[in-house]
Amino acid sequence: MATHSTNEFRGGLKVMVDGDPCSIIDNEFVKPGKGQAFNRVKFRNLKTGRVLERTFKSGETLPAADVVEVEMQYLYNDGEFWHFMTSENYEQHAASKEAVAEAKQWLKEEALCMVTMWNGVPLSVEPPNFVELKITETEPGVRGDTATGGTKRAKLETGAVVRVPLFLNEGEIIKVDTRRGEYVSRAK
């Protein structure tokens, strides 16, 4: 199995720590005036989402995590699991509530997502950067009602709630940035 030395540690590198796959968030090289140099490393556990901080002596190694990012199509939610399919071989995988997390509010059937896999199990799901969703609930925009800054709340078909301009009505399809959860434009 491949290993990574402390001088190869970079943000985003996937390594195994205590038997769990982790992603390095931050790596700081420290050379004290007296004593051996060391690295102070911040990790995110990909299974639990927890952030850990550890120190490693200069030259120590960690095994590489066999983590793969695969583009998959979202199929459906059966109440407990979210089901995804790879486009190449039509293999299906079930992602848990923890793996889907915040992405569930942006998932629409047939959407292409990036799924982080470890040993054949989905660890996390990243929705597309932009999605087109239908407005299912919003107040009617009243002309001249701009005291609130010209936006109103709108509930989308997936259950997500975003702020939209007053001119949008129920039934319209809008483009939303999933990274910030903001309205971008009307869908063309």
Swiss-Prot record:
The entry's keywords: Cytoplasm, Elongation factor, Hydroxylation, Protein biosynthesis
InterPro entries: Elong-fact-P_C, NA-bd_OB-fold, Rib_uL2_dom2, Transl_elong_fac_P/YeiP, Transl_elong_KOW-like, Transl_elong_P/YeiP_cen, Transl_elong_P/YeiP_CS, Transl_elongation_fac_P
PROSITE patterns: EFP
Compartments it resides in: Cytoplasm
Gene name for this UniProt entry: efp
Role summary: Involved in peptide bond synthesis. Alleviates ribosome stalling that occurs when 3 or more consecutive Pro residues or the sequence PPG is present in a protein, possibly by augmenting the peptidyl transferase activity of the ribosome. Modification of Lys-34 is required for alleviation.
Keyword Cytoplasm on entry: yes
Protein name in the entry: Elongation factor P
Pathway in which this enzyme or protein is active: Protein biosynthesis; polypeptide chain elongation
GO cellular component, one term: cytoplasm
Protein source organism: Coxiella burnetii (strain RSA 493 / Nine Mile phase I)
Keyword Cytoplasm among record annotations: yes
GO MF entries: translation elongation factor activity
PTM annotation (N6-(3,6-diaminohexanoyl)-5-hydroxylysine): residues: K34
